[in-house]
């Protein structure tokens, strides 16, 4: 297939770039060129900022007929409207990367039909608005969109934590016996998915014909409390973590930017009902166990 990625070298997308290249697809990546060391060897790469499309880039995009376009970097409704204008009538399928952060607090397994939306975190609110634009374009213009909702996705070169942006700083905190902040009592249930597994599911979905207009959560079926996630770090590093439990609301009041992703997302119970995607991808649950995935991330950090 002839596939266009806008993005493709981030923590969620790099695995997909490498997997699709290995399967022989004709893959083109448009990135700003900040992480070219992550590019697969044989893909076509164009260095450009897709938010500022010049005449040459516009001609290249519109003069090619793409089987699939995946934009990893849509964060608001204006970007969604731009891509609809740019690609409608020129592609077979367009994949919008949304997020499971759009769901509010739900005390049962989450499936794609649930309409309880996150109104707290601006990131999630913007993704919801973009989703609505794409869904309307599918209904009114037959725009061939497929909406994918990944959860908290990590990879070999990232360390997933409850504090956004902490990353490898967590390993330093543990090794230096510093306090490690855990929101509330650490008992909220959370789901972490390795980017290799997201890539495998995306690859399968790209090959399917009759899924335009569909929405899929792409998340692991394994879930753990934040307390248990940090216990895995303890086991892997063979080092006791000096945890400090702090109410999420207190974190937010002290630091809005730090606390917003917690009160708007990471303090929720996020357990998923994956029955929809299991019906079309039989080996969906063959995912990397969290213990094994974090072992790979820690090895990379060393």
Where are these regions (language model features)?
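Mid/C-terminal beta-alpha module of Rossmann-like enzyme folds, strongest
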Residues: 204-262
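Conserved C-terminal active-site "lid" loop/helix of NAD(P)H-dependent oxidoreductases
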Residues: 195, 252-284
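Substrate-positioning beta->alpha
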Residues: 162-171, 182-207, 213-214
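N-terminal Rossmann NAD(P)H-binding glycine-rich loop of SDR-like oxidoreductase domains
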Residues: 3-23
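NAD(P)-cofactor binding segment of oxidoreductase domains
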Residues: 60, 64-109, 125-136
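Conserved beta-loop-beta element that borders a ligand/cofactor-binding pocket
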Residues: 134-159
């Amino acid at each position: 297939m002839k596939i266009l990625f806008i993005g493709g070298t981030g923590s969620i997308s790099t695995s997909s770039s490498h997997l699709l290249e290995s399967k022989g697809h004709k893959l083109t990546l448009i990135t700003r060129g900040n992480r070219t060391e992550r590019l697969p060897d044989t893909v076509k790469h164009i260095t450009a900022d897709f938010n500022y499309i010049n005449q040459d880039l516009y001609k290249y995009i519109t003069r090619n007929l793409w089987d699939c376009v995946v934009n990893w970097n849509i964060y608001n409704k204006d970007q969604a409207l731009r891509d609809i204008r740019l690609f409608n009538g020129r592609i077979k399928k367009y994949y919008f990367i949304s997020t499971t952060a759009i769901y509010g607090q739900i005390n049962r397994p989450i499936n794609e039909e649930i309409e309880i939306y996150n109104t707290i975190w601006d990131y999630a609110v913007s993704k919801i608005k973009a989703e609505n634009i794409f869904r309307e374009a599918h209904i009114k213009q037959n725009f061939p969109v497929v909406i994918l909702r990944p959860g908290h996705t990590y990879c070999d070169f990232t360390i997933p934590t409850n504090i956004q942006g902490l990353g490898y700083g967590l390993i330093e905190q543990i090794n230096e016996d510093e306090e490690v902040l855990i929101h509330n009592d650490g008992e909220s249930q959370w789901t972490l998915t390795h980017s290799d597994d997201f890539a495998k599911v995306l690859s399968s979905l790209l090959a399917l014909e009759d899924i335009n207009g569909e929405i899929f959560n792409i998340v692991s079926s394994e879930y753990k409390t934040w307390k248990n996630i940090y216990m895995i770090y303890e086991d892997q590093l063979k080092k006791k973590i000096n945890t400090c439990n702090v109410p999420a609301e207190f974190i937010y009041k002290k630091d809005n930017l730090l606390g917003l992703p917690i009160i708007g997302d990471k303090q929720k119970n996020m357990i998923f009902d994956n029955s929809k995607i299991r019906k079309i991808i039989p080996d969906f649950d063959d995912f990397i166990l969290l213990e094994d995935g974090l072992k790979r991330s820690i090895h990379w950090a060393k």
